Curated annotation (Swiss-Prot):
Family of this protein: Belongs to the 14-3-3 family.
Alphabetical keyword list: Acetylation, Cytoplasm
Gene Ontology CC terms, in alphabetical order: cytoplasm
Site positions for Interaction with phosphoserine on interacting protein: R56, R127
Matching Gene3D superfamilies: 14-3-3 domain
Annotated positions of the N-acetylmethionine modification: M1
Pfam families: 14-3-3
Quaternary structure annotation from Swiss-Prot or TrEMBL: Homodimer, and heterodimer with other family members.
SUPFAM superfamilies reported for this sequence: 14-3-3 protein
Compartments where found: Cytoplasm
Free-text function comment from the UniProt entry: Adapter protein implicated in the regulation of a large spectrum of both general and specialized signaling pathways. Binds to a large number of partners, usually by recognition of a phosphoserine or phosphothreonine motif. Binding generally results in the modulation of the activity of the binding partner.
Gene transcribed to yield this protein: ywhab-a
InterPro entries: 14-3-3, 14-3-3_CS, 14-3-3_dom_sf, 14-3-3_domain
Protein name: 14-3-3 protein beta/alpha-A
């Protein structure tokens, strides 16, 4: 199958909501080694976001059930084994994406926005790994996530408009990383507020093409800020995930 056929198959899979097939097609496109177009880049991102998102959601549900079955050894063991199965699937998906990023996507990225997009993606997938990791493994994945986000953040600040949807999406996810993974609400709020304020100050630079995306992410930044700064930021904050 040539590149155009693989891309067509990915689009067909997306319409059928068969995201594993979509991811397989876009993985094959990436492994051809050429720099991806914006459309191909977005297809790859959507495919893997759905594939990993399903496992992250399952993992949270099963982990919750596992905790509630304390005192019932048989049921708890079943829940634990099932959680470990989902965990392995999630880790394999993340490692697949990180391998594509390290071997093809980041090295081949030439425009700053592509570099930021892929480094943000790298930060995201190390973050997903850190959600299910423990001990030394958790420390490593957290450090790798922060490093990728930070590198992307520095490029975005120097090369992109504050209203650019990729820059805003990065600020959104990096702030979620600070809040949920590093348990640093002050840093999370500071980062989200700066990104929001800088974008508001330059709203006139918004082009028609990205207006909808940018304003949606700005709304998510504001929603997170409202939640994080409210008094009852306990349990409900765990459900906040401003993934873009």
């Amino acid at each position: 199958m040539d590149k155009s056929e693989l891309v067509q198959k990915a689009k067909l899979s997306e319409q059928a909501e068969r995201y594993d097939d979509m991811a397989a097609s876009m993985k094959a496109v990436t492994e051809l080694g050429a720099e991806l177009s914006n459309e191909e880049r977005n297809l790859l991102s959507v495919a893997y976001k759905n594939v990993v998102g399903a496992r992250r959601s399952s993992w949270r549900v099963i982990s919750s059930i596992e905790q509630k079955t304390e005192g019932n050894d048989k049921r708890q063991q079943m829940a634990r084994e099932y959680r470990e199965k989902v965990e392995t699937e999630l880790q394999d998906i993340c490692k697949d994406v990180l391998d594509l990023l390290d071997r093809f996507l980041v090295p081949n990225a030439t425009p700053p926005e592509s570099k930021v997009f892929y480094l943000k993606m790298k930060g995201d997938y190390y973050r997903y790994l850190s959600e299910v990791a423990s001990g030394d493994s958790k420390q490593e994945t957290v450090a790798s996530s922060q490093q990728a986000y930070q590198e992307a953040f520095e490029i975005s600040k120097s090369e992109m408009q504050p209203t650019h949807p990729i820059r805003l999406g990065l600020a959104l996810n990096f702030s979620v990383f600070y809040y949920e993974i590093l348990n640093s609400p002050e840093k999370a709020c500071s980062l989200a507020k700066s990104a929001f304020d800088e974008a508001i100050a330059e709203l006139d630079t918004l082009n028609e093409e990205s207006y909808k995306d940018s304003t949606l992410i700005m709304q998510l930044l504001r929603d997170n800020l409202t939640l994080w700064t409210s008094e009852n930021q306990g349990e409900e904050a765990d459900n906040v995930e401003g993934d873009n």
